[in-house]
Amino acid sequence: MTLRLDSLKANKGARRRKLRKGRGIAAGQGASCGFGMRGQKSRSGRPTRPGFEGGQMPLYRRVPKLKHFPLVNPKHFTVLNVSALKDLKDGATVNLDSLVKDGIVTSPKHPLKMLGNGELTVKNLTVQASAFTTSARTKIEAAGGTCETLD
């Protein structure tokens, strides 16, 4: 048998007959058309709109609007307070590699950000970090050190 356009047939069960609702009991979907006896879901003009709860205040109006959506690509930092630099020698150069080597930071996974919590007793530090808070920068520079921002 050759394959031609006039010899094509759909597979058995692939073409189902359209249900004709409300056309008599012999059709199987007569009278109530499969919508049950009474109630709002059996009436014409159905269905109710999405989110409608029968007149009760719907959930999407009961719950407050969401504010402050999270950032899609937030910046992650390894944060360190200036009080953690108290064990270093005067005039030392501080960067992420030296902090890992000294055991102050455990993992160099993210760039370093210096925070200004605590007191800085070490003098003349050269701190190389990706970001500084204003208080950290003022405390390091007040102790005679310099802040170098890395890219």
UniProtKB/Swiss-Prot annotation:
Record-level Gene Ontology MF annotations: rRNA binding; structural constituent of ribosome
Cysteine pairs bridged by disulfides in the record: none
Any one GO cellular component localisation term in the record: cytosolic large ribosomal subunit
InterPro entries xrefs: Ribosomal_uL15 (IPR030878), Ribosomal_uL15/eL18 (IPR021131), Ribosomal_uL15/eL18_sf (IPR036227), Ribosomal_uL15_bac-type (IPR005749), Ribosomal_uL15_CS (IPR001196)
Biased composition (Gly residues): 25-37
Region (Disordered): 1-57
Entry keyword set: Ribonucleoprotein, Ribosomal protein, RNA-binding, rRNA-binding
One Gene Ontology biological process: translation
Subunit structure: Part of the 50S ribosomal subunit.
PANTHER family hit by this protein: 50S RIBOSOMAL PROTEIN L15 (PTHR12934), LARGE RIBOSOMAL SUBUNIT PROTEIN UL15M (PTHR12934:SF11)
Family, per entry: Belongs to the universal ribosomal protein uL15 family.
Role noted for this protein: Binds to the 23S rRNA.
Name of protein: Large ribosomal subunit protein uL15
Species assigned in the record: Synechococcus sp. (strain CC9902)
